[in-house]
Amino acid sequence: MGQPEILRATPAQSGALTALMHASSAYQGDYASILDGYVVTPGYVETHPTFTATTGGELLGFYALLEDPPELDILFVADAAQGLGLGARLVGHMLGEARARGITRVRVVSHPPALPFYLRMGARRTGTIPPNPPKVRWERPELRFDVPTG
């Protein structure tokens, strides 16, 4: 696999972004309900800075950054691309985008199994989000990235 290219997503990619999310093994079983009916729309991609990681035209991952208030809303890496450092590259890119937009802190409400990843990336845990049934029946870690200034 070559070095993935990280580029701004286009609204035309919204279907592929949705498919990548729904194919994630991290959201099967008990966690499947959170994605039930969830669609990344063309309007979402137009409104929020959304970036894809691709290699040879293959979508390997993406993230979306909300600006007001600042939050890493979505971060997914295809199952086959996990463990290769792509998640770290996407987080680094997101922090660069946040800095370029004058954002100093980025909130993350994490999928519970992803908590160790975010801590390794430098996020600090700030709290716990309670369950919100019926879609979210579990507590979720809340974290924050302090955006480097340099």
Which positions does each model-derived feature cover?
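Conserved N-terminal entry element of GNAT/NAT acetyltransferase domains
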Residues: 1-12, 147-150
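Acetyl-CoA-dependent GNAT
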Residues: 11-74, 78-79, 91-92, 97
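Glycine-rich ATP-binding loop(s) of histidine-kinase-like ATPases
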Residues: 82
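Glycine-rich phosphate-binding loop
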Residues: 85
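Conserved GNAT acetyl-CoA-binding A-motif
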Residues: 98-111
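Conserved catalytic-core motifs of GNAT/GCN5-like acyltransferases
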Residues: 107-109, 124-143
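Conserved active-site tyrosine of GNAT-family acetyltransferases
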Residues: 118
